[in-house]
Curated annotation (Swiss-Prot):
Interacts with PEX7. Pfam families: PEX18_PEX21_C. Keywords: Cytoplasm, Peroxisome, Protein transport, Thioester bond, Transport, Ubl conjugation. One of its GO terms (cellular component) is peroxisome. It is found in: Cytoplasm, Cytosol; Peroxisome. There is a cross-link at C5 (Glycyl cysteine thioester (Cys-Gly) (interchain with G-Cter in ubiquitin)). It comes from the Eukaryota. This is Peroxisomal protein PEX21.
Amino acid sequence: MSQYCAADPIQRMVSRKGPYLDTQQQRVYKHRSGTGHGTNIRQPTTGIVEATFLQNNSGMNAVHPTTLNVQTHNAHATGRTIAKSVDTNSWVNDFSSMKVQDPLEFADSYKNLYKQYEQKQFHNTVPAQCPRNLYIPTVTRPQTTLNIVDHHEDKSSAVDQLIDDEFEKIEEEVKDQNQKLEFQESAQSFIEICERSQMKEKLQRSKFFQVMQKVSDGEATIRQDGENYVIR
């Protein structure tokens, strides 16, 4: 049977060849398997234990300085954090104990008087029988409304008077036009009568006939000025 197929693992380790398997380890195997003597095994076993202890001790010494340095660094950082926290707390306490004096601030007596004034105004405004949320203040009509209405009425009266005056002027102009047409028609009738008369030549030489001729042609007009008539 091959050495790799052996049932006992210790036997496989002993059968391997290498720098780490010496005669002492073989003797340990013999001791465990019952083929060796107890007096020969005790001393090598002690050597293996001492070597293992020394190896572990050297490993601990290699790791211990780094661990110590990390712990020391953490201790310093913790100390700085605690000191910073203490400084912050002291700053907060100092800030909270500060008293600011504003020279523009009102005096306490003035504040109390103003508070009493506000309470008095509140009690005078809100009725005692009605809740505050149901109070509806009465709205008084301003006096300026009447003045605006009066001013509007005066302005309307002035506009009406102006319109009346314009209508009177138009009526006068229409009346003058009617009179002008009436006088013109009368002048035309007078001219026609004079032309049919036997005294036509004599009437045509008169100034009145010449005026009537101008009125009939529209070159002149007759306007009534009171009781008199004016030819223009």
